[in-house]
Design a protein with these regions (language model features):
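Hydrophobic alpha-helical segments, especially transmembrane helices
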Residues: 4-5, 219
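Eukaryotic scaffold repeat domains enriched in small/polar residues
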Residues: 19-325
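Sec-dependent N-terminal signal peptides
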Residues: 5-14
Length: 325
């Protein structure tokens, strides 16, 4: 018994120390491996399944435009990629969406997505069967039945979930597992607890909510009831697009996007924080890695610590492996 505990403690110590020694990442330059005739549209969302598959939400031939189009995308917009090879294992989602945006894979491998043109949130099982729809199609609003360009979803272990809503409404809304409206918080502004495009969000196991407050260039942390805890302000003036917590809850990842005074893209950075929002390292346009960095829209870390990014200028996916020093 003592030997068993010693092994477990040693393993825990090794994992913690290994994680503490991760200072940089290297690009997996042969990932993904897509068919030559396959055209990846704007990849707007990334998730990871329990089996470590990479799930991607992309726009096919659709490009962002205002006013929003009304026709649904003909291509399959949900891709299931092999974690190691980057090959497509499955694809579905044709004739379902107008303007794909956020994606979340919950702990039961259900796939949640938002469509900003439809003003809706969808829940599917892993093979594409529709399980739940929230919001009224093509109708925006600010009540408990409507969204206004919802951007992302985060699902808790008990099945309740949060929606960042979004481009049109500056709020975060919580729903029960069954999709019943529970409460919301936030309004447009720059004070603590206010938002200017809540663009992405994630949860830790304590129920705290981390929000990428895009146009305010910051990440805000709240408790499960929406009570403000802390924030991190991006001093490089980069818009914060997405956040993601690793499965072991050792760190939080974030991504930003910077344009200069002439509205020319400068690129994105990847940030790594502890869960108290203390910045530990960053890479991307700031250097220290060999990947491309144009406009990252989403970020995800898999069960092995590999980082994945979705770039909507390059229409590309990238994988970064951790380097243990």
């Amino acid at each position: 018994m003592i030997k068993k505990y010693f092994v477990l403690i040693s393993l825990f110590f090794f994992i913690c120390c290994a994680d503490d020694n991760i200072k940089s990442y290297e690009l997996a330059d042969q990932w993904p491996s897509l068919p030559n005739d396959f055209v990846l549209g704007n990849p707007t969302g990334i998730g990871v399944s329990s089996s470590n598959d990479i799930v991607v939400f992309h726009r096919g031939s659709r490009v962002w435009q205002t006013p929003m189009p009304t026709e649904k995308i003909k291509e399959k917009t949900i891709l299931i990629l092999d974690n190691k090879t980057g090959e497509i294992k499955n694809a579905w989602g044709s004739d379902l969406f107008i303007m794909p945006h956020g994606l979340e894979v919950d702990n039961e491998d259900n796939i949640w997505v938002t469509d900003v043109a439809l003003h809706q949130v969808f829940k599917f099982n892993y093979t594409g069967d529709l399980l739940m729809v929230l919001g009224i199609p093509n109708q925006s609003g600010v009540d408990s039945f409507h969204f206004n360009l919802p951007t992302d979803v985060a699902v808790s272990p008990n099945g309740s979930f949060y929606v960042s809503d979004g481009y049109g409404n500056s709020r975060v809304v919580k729903f029960s597992r069954q999709g019943e409206y529970l409460f919301e918080w936030g309004k447009f502004g720059t004070d603590k607890g206010e938002f200017n495009i809540p663009h992405g969000l994630d949860l830790d196991k304590s129920g705290n909510v981390y929000v990428a407050d895009r146009e305010n260039n910051r990440i805000q942390k709240f408790d499960s009831l929406g009570g403000f805890i802390s924030l991190w302000q991006n001093k490089s003036k980069g818009q914060l697009y997405s956040v993601n917590i690793d499965k072991s809850e050792n760190y939080l990842l974030g991504i930003d996007y910077v344009i200069n005074e002439n509205f020319i893209p400068v690129g994105s950075d990847i940030f790594r924080f502890d869960l108290n929002l203390n910045l530990k390292t960053r890479f991307g346009r700031s250097g220290f890695y060999n990947g491309k960095s144009k406009r990252y829209h989403d970020i995800q870390v898999d069960n092995n610590g590999n980082i994945y990014t979705a770039d909507i200028i390059d229409n590309s996916l990238q994988k970064f492996r951790p380097i243990i020093n």
